[in-house]
Amino acid sequence: MSLTSSSAPSDSIVELIQSQNLSGSGSGTGGNTGSTTMNSGNFIPTPSLTGTGASQSSGSASSGNFVSPDETDTKPSPSLMDHNDPTSSLSQQLAQGATLTSPYSTTTVDPSSLYFQLSPMSYIPNVSSATTVAAANMSAYFNQKSAYPTSHLGFPSNVGSHSFLQSNMYIPSSLSDCPTATMGSMSWNANQPGFSRKQRRERTTFTRNQLEILESYFVKTRYPDIFMREDMAHKIQLPESRVQVWFKNRRAKARQQKKTLAPSNSGVTCSGNNGSTGGGSSNGSTGSEVQPSSPATTDSELKFSEVIKEECDEQSISPSADDQKGVNSYINPISSSSGTTSYNGTSSFRPQAQYPYASYPAYDFQYSQSNTNSTNTYTLDGNSTWKFQMS
């Protein structure tokens, strides 16, 4: 049997060996002797059996001698049985409720940590006792019946080294495992019976007959009153509000089409009668043509093109004879002979160009030409000092 103690110092073992007088060498006959080997603080009693009637017992304190456990007998020496066995005393102390402490272990367990067993905090990870010493302390603490009885808490007396938390307690490893962190739970109020979300109304689809009735009223008036709207609603079997909204959208569409077609003459062309003024046969179209910028694909666009056609027909009516006379009285027709104008190249663009040089109007004053051969004499202080010939 071997006992290895890593917590006790080596000096205490040496003293124990010296007190038992196990070191030395001797001889004996017909008996069992034991050899003790100490290796770096390891106390290993190794009894040996001899059958020749003589045996030798030796003790060595060298650190280089090792004794194999297979070569030794499992039965301890009688000399060791007489003294205090450390393992038996340790088991007796633990049975009596003593506390085992180690000078190299600083782990202590506070009894107040049992509060976490009663707390509903499920996010505490699964923990266990760190060392066997801590487990022994807890076991010795709960075995004391007189100190703090824990029977009312429902905990087992033998705590051992199992987890302080319940074994069936589930601790999620990530946030996605938590049922309260999902998006479905965040919208819990949407599933409540008192919470009613406003549903969007479906778009009304008009049939061809309904559009024909509405377009016929739109040609008559663009702003029908309540009575006309109710009459239309009764005919097309739709609410009056739908009729009102349709007229509102139809007016907006008409304004938009008018803006796009009015500036460009290529969009809508209204052609009148193209023919001779003498009342002969017409070479062009006898009626008005409507050429929309884009082909009408819906019934509403067809009706709108008909409205534009009627307006063009009214504008393309030829003026009457009386209207033509009134126009001729203000505007003289321009003949083809007077189409060209000749300009005189010699005339200049001056106000006097319309008069010839000989026919200028006479003015009241005339210029007289003086004699160029006369001599002009100038006097200065009565003396004729300045004389010069005028040429």
Curated annotation (Swiss-Prot):
SUPFAM superfamilies cross-referenced by the UniProt entry: Homeodomain-like (SSF46689)
Segment forming the signal sequence: none
Region: Disordered, residue numbers: 1-106, 254-300, 312-347
This protein's UniProt keywords: Developmental protein, DNA-binding, Homeobox, Neurogenesis, Nucleus
Expression across tissues: Expressed in the bilateral AFD neurons as well as in the nine pharyngeal marginal cells. Expressed in amphid sheath AMsh and phasmid sheath PHsh glia.
Polar residues compositional bias, start-end: 1-10, 86-106, 289-299, 315-334
GO molecular function terms attached to this record: DNA-binding transcription factor activity; DNA-binding transcription factor activity, RNA polymerase II-specific; RNA polymerase II cis-regulatory region sequence-specific DNA binding; RNA polymerase II transcription regulatory region sequence-specific DNA binding
Compositional bias annotation for Low complexity: 34-64, 264-274, 335-347
GO biological process: embryo development ending in birth or egg hatching; neuron differentiation; positive regulation of transcription by RNA polymerase II; regulation of microvillus assembly; regulation of non-motile cilium assembly; regulation of transcription by RNA polymerase II; thermosensory behavior; transcription by RNA polymerase II
Result after altering residue 125 to L: In ns259; homozygous sterile. Significantly reduced expression of VEGF-related protein ver-1 in AMsh glia when cultured at 25 degrees Celsius
Pfam families, per database record: Homeodomain
UniProt DNA-binding residue ranges: 199-258
GO CC entries: nucleus
Presence of the UniProt keyword Nucleotide-binding in the record: no
UniProt-annotated location(s): Nucleus
Functional note: Probable transcription factor. Binds to a motif including the sequence 5'-TAA[TG]-3' in regulatory promoter elements. Modulates expression of its own, and of various other, genes in the AFD thermosensory neurons or AMsh amphid sheath glia, incuding the nuclear hormone receptor nhr-38, the LIM homeobox ceh-14, cyclic nucleotide-gated channel tax-2, receptor-type guanylyl cyclase gcy-8 and VEGF-related protein ver-1. Required for the development and cell fate of AFD neurons.
Family: Belongs to the paired homeobox family. Bicoid subfamily.
Record protein name field: Homeobox protein ttx-1
